[in-house]
């Protein structure tokens, strides 16, 4: 059974796991009709519709602009032409470029390796793709998700989880001409790695992923802060797993996102319950329940445990609350949401894991604290089974 599962993994991942690079659409949160790009390290060859146009280094600055059904490419000196596709290909393994949308509030971002530019299917904007080494991409994701504020053991764990998530979703956008995007829909990827400790941790865990007892890649869920107790997967996504179970977590209790408060006008709260959920707010007992809800010894799934059950995740989404881990108390003409944690609460609690790393827990110990009964697998070990 185990060997059969390995064969299945090797087959399904053979086109992706052993590839060295990945295509990531960047700048996806903005409508890109024009941007400026310039190398910051190494030299780049510039191609328009497959024809070599120029070779440039850090002194070169280029603007690409949507022009009807084509891409206009300009340097400071001249217009190089209009094309259906433009590529900037690094000539060194450590090539990097900076890019900025021609919008005043946009920030400069820096990425490594190559850049491919084409039109979106509707020809209304530019599609900008970073063709990048997978391990460099993972480093960028780890830093985008975690920042530069913790220890190497945490970065190692986050790298493994990011790699696992990537390989489980590696062709999410393949029909759109790329593999993953740079937003949280896939994984946040806002720049290349800047902190050398991050890339060092990525390199130290190269090829490692997490699998369950059936040797399937796990759902590598994580969130900012669980508020003291993580949530089982079935209570958020209605999908039960053997490894995403509720875990009591004291490590995150004194971290930045452990507590929050929100005040909502009482009349707004009553109207919401009545109009959306047909909650009988005029019933005196039900009104007490609606204004004195508490989560005591464990996290609740529903707003009430009586006849009418309203999912807490629905209330969280409707009021844009930080978590579902909250209690409610009436204070005058308001209801106060006294909350704990930040995020959906499933899987790794990032702030708890960071605290564990600071306390000298190893990345393997942290992994097994939040994900029960999982295993680390080196993808290179699958070569044997792939060749059988």
Regions found by a protein language model. Give the residues of each.
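Positively charged n-region of N-terminal signal peptides that target proteins for export
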Residues: 1-4
